[in-house]
């Protein structure tokens, strides 16, 4: 089928926060680089009045409709209206729920936002986020042994965003910059509980990212060495040596997304799952 246009409307209708839909929609849209998705997100849609406004908006800008609505009547309204105006729609969770029901031999609860219940896991995530923010960029090294994971790496290896992503999964994460000539904190070297992981990237990639950082800030950096490929190569050599000396695993983040890096870290220690 030929490409219709260089953009399309993507309607994401949810009875909860919409996070599941946004992730699924973006993952699918990313496979079609020739067309740009114009996202329309409708969270917390739980009654007919709210849904009618959404359906009118879809009618005004037809496109692909993805939804996670557990109320069967509301879901039926979406299906019917989409058929009437001739747009495709998919209930993202239904095939998964049906698979679970078939395998487990029991019906689902059909409860909106069930994944966001304020249970023990929720409070564990909040605790992990607080810990991670308090221990960003080498802060509070004395209690690194309370961490589940400690990330170390030279500048611009995505330590902070990866730490936050892990914290959102309930994993307490600290991160420390590796700077040649600057010793790591004693608190890290004494810690026995956390998984310590080194993050590296190619010198070319780091030079490019650092150049963008320098251009986008008034912050002072250490001269041309910060972006110089040869100097960066020496930083990376030091980081590799440091990790090898302490038997810490290394992950190259050059071609990895934050999510892929986090998955690789979790795979190193199954109990983090």
From Swiss-Prot:
Enzyme Commission designation: 2.7.11.32, 2.7.4.27
Keyword annotations for this protein, in alphabetical order, are: Kinase, Nucleotide-binding, Serine/threonine-protein kinase, Transferase
Keyword check for Transferase: yes
User: Broadest EC class?
Assistant: transferase
Q: Where along this sequence does the record place binding of ADP?
A: 153-160
* Pfam family, any one: Kinase-PPPase
One of the entry's Gene Ontology molecular-function terms is: ATP binding
**Taxonomically, which superkingdom?**
Bacteria
Task: Enumerate the catalysed reactions.
Answer: N(tele)-phospho-L-histidyl/L-threonyl-[pyruvate, phosphate dikinase] + ADP = N(tele)-phospho-L-histidyl/O-phospho-L-threonyl-[pyruvate, phosphate dikinase] + AMP + H(+); N(tele)-phospho-L-histidyl/O-phospho-L-threonyl-[pyruvate, phosphate dikinase] + phosphate + H(+) = N(tele)-phospho-L-histidyl/L-threonyl-[pyruvate, phosphate dikinase] + diphosphate
User: Which NCBIfam families does this one have?
Assistant: PRK05339.1
The protein here is known as Putative pyruvate, phosphate dikinase regulatory protein
Q: What is the lineage of its organism?
A: Bacteria, Pseudomonadati, Pseudomonadota, Alphaproteobacteria, Hyphomicrobiales
Cite the HAMAP family for this sequence: PDRP (MF_00921)
Q: Which InterPro entries match?
A: Kinase-pyrophosphorylase (IPR005177), PPDK_reg (IPR026565)
What is this protein's function?
Bifunctional serine/threonine kinase and phosphorylase involved in the regulation of the pyruvate, phosphate dikinase (PPDK) by catalyzing its phosphorylation/dephosphorylation.
């Amino acid at each position: 089928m030929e490409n219709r246009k260089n953009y399309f409307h993507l309607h994401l209708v949810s009875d909860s926060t919409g996070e599941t839909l946004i992730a699924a929609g973006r993952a699918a849209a990313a496979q079609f680089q020739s067309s740009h998705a114009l996202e329309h997100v409708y969270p917390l849609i739980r009654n007919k009045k709210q849904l009618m406004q959404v359906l009118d908006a879809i009618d005004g800008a037809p496109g692909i409709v993805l939804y996670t609505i557990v109320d069967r009547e509301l879901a039926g309204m979406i299906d019917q209206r989409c058929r009437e105006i001739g747009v495709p729609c998919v209930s993202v969770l239904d095939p998964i729920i049906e698979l679970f029901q078939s395998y487990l031999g029991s019906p689902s609860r059909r409860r909106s936002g069930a994944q966001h219940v304020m249970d023990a896991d929720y409070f564990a995530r909040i605790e992990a986020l607080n810990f991670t923010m308090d221990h960003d960029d080498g802060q509070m090294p004395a209690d690194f042994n309370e961490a589940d994971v400690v990330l170390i790496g030279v500048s611009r290896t995505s330590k902070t965003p990866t730490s936050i992503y892990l914290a959102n999964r309930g994993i307490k994460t600290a991160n420390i910059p590796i700077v040649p000539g600057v010793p790591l904190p004693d608190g890290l070297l004494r810690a026995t509980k956390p998984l310590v992981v080194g993050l590296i990237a190619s010198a070319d990639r780091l030079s490019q990212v650092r150049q963008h950082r320098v251009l986008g800030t008034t912050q002072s950096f250490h001269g041309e060495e910060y972006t110089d490929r040869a100097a960066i190569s020496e930083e990376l050599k030091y980081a590799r040596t440091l990790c090898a000396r302490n038997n810490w695993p290394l992950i190259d983040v050059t071609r990895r997304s934050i999510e892929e890096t986090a998955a690789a870290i979790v795979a190193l220690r199954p109990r983090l799952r």
